[in-house]
């Protein structure tokens, strides 16, 4: 029988993702904290935090899971033509804090954000420790889009993206998958399917299959050059 686990502030093991609730889909545990070691343990086992500002910390492992395989991200002919016309430039790990702040801005028709100050502080610490990373899209000196997430071995766990100009978040995703191919990453965890991810080629897989893929690649050593701050070219 699936049941909700309650975590305290002492570090403890997460329950198996198989025990997550089906309604709401994937809710596994409640409580605990956002210390780096707890967050890294969560992602290592296919679990991530997602909660509103007034809620306790909620931990999830949904079924199905949204994933990308690097090299299988879709780019339509119209998007390719659009991006070729843009004077944008792209960087890796140049403005992590600003990317998080961009992602934290409430979306249209949303009253608030799940990327709270607490979340931002926790992931900035992960970035400082070399675990969380960002992709930036620039128009001149203006940050117009980007995304951030965590690297666990040869797996990139995407967290959020944003745009301030049309298609800038899609460009960030395309740049990310290009970079991950070059650095021999094997899997992108996109967490929960939505129309935006689906349009880019995300696929839903059963949680058990996702955990199998995660287990296969999470202990592999990543290319040490993967997250050196750099300016890169989007190849279209």
Curated annotation (Swiss-Prot):
Subcellular location field? Cytoplasm
* Organism domain of life: Bacteria
Q: Which Pfam families match?
A: Leu_Phe_trans
Q: What is its EC number?
A: 2.3.2.6
Q: Which UniProt keywords apply?
A: Acyltransferase, Cytoplasm, Transferase
Q: Which reaction does it catalyse?
A: N-terminal L-lysyl-[protein] + L-leucyl-tRNA(Leu) = N-terminal L-leucyl-L-lysyl-[protein] + tRNA(Leu) + H(+); N-terminal L-arginyl-[protein] + L-leucyl-tRNA(Leu) = N-terminal L-leucyl-L-arginyl-[protein] + tRNA(Leu) + H(+); L-phenylalanyl-tRNA(Phe) + an N-terminal L-alpha-aminoacyl-[protein] = an N-terminal L-phenylalanyl-L-alpha-aminoacyl-[protein] + tRNA(Phe)
Among InterPro entries, the record links this protein to: Acyl_CoA_acyltransferase (IPR016181), Leu/Phe-tRNA_Trfase (IPR004616), Leu/Phe-tRNA_Trfase_C (IPR042203), Leu/Phe-tRNA_Trfase_N (IPR042221)
- GO-annotated molecular function: leucyl-tRNA--protein transferase activity
Q: What biological process terms from GO does the record include?
A: protein catabolic process
Q: Which GO terms describe its cellular component?
A: cytoplasm
Give the family from UniProt: Belongs to the L/F-transferase family.
State what this protein does.
Answer: Functions in the N-end rule pathway of protein degradation where it conjugates Leu, Phe and, less efficiently, Met from aminoacyl-tRNAs to the N-termini of proteins containing an N-terminal arginine or lysine.
Q: Which HAMAP family match?
A: Leu_Phe_trans
The name under which this protein is listed is Leucyl/phenylalanyl-tRNA--protein transferase
Q: Which organism is it from?
A: Shewanella sp. (strain MR-4)
What lineage is on file? Bacteria, Pseudomonadati, Pseudomonadota, Gammaproteobacteria, Alteromonadales
């Amino acid at each position: 029988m699936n049941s909700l686990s309650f975590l305290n502030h002492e570090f403890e093991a997460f329950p198996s993702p198989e025990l997550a609730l089906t309604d709401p889909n994937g809710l596994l545990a409640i409580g605990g904290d956002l210390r780096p070691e707890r967050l890294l343990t969560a992602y290592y086992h296919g679990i991530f935090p997602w909660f509103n500002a007034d809620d306790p910390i909620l931990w999830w492992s949904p079924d199905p899971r949204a994933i990308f395989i690097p090299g299988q991200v879709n780019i339509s002919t119209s998007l390719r033509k659009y991006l070729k016309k843009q004077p944008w430039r792209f960087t890796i790990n140049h403005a992590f804090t600003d990317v998080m702040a961009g992602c934290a801005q409430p979306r249209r028709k949303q009253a608030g954000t799940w990327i709270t100050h607490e979340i931002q502080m926790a992931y900035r610490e992960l970035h400082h420790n070399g675990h969380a990373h960002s992709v930036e899209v620039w128009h001149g000196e203006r940050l117009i889009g980007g995304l951030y997430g965590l690297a666990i071995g040869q797996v990139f766990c995407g967290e959020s993206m944003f745009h301030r100009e049309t298609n800038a978040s899609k460009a960030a995703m395309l740049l990310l998958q290009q970079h991950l191919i070059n650095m021999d990453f094997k899997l992108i965890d996109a967490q929960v399917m939505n129309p935006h991810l689906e349009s880019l080629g995300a696929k839903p897989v059963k949680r058990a299959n996702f955990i199998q893929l995660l287990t296969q690649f999470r202990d592999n050593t990543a290319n040490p050059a993967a997250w050196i701050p750099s300016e890169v070219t989007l190849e279209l």
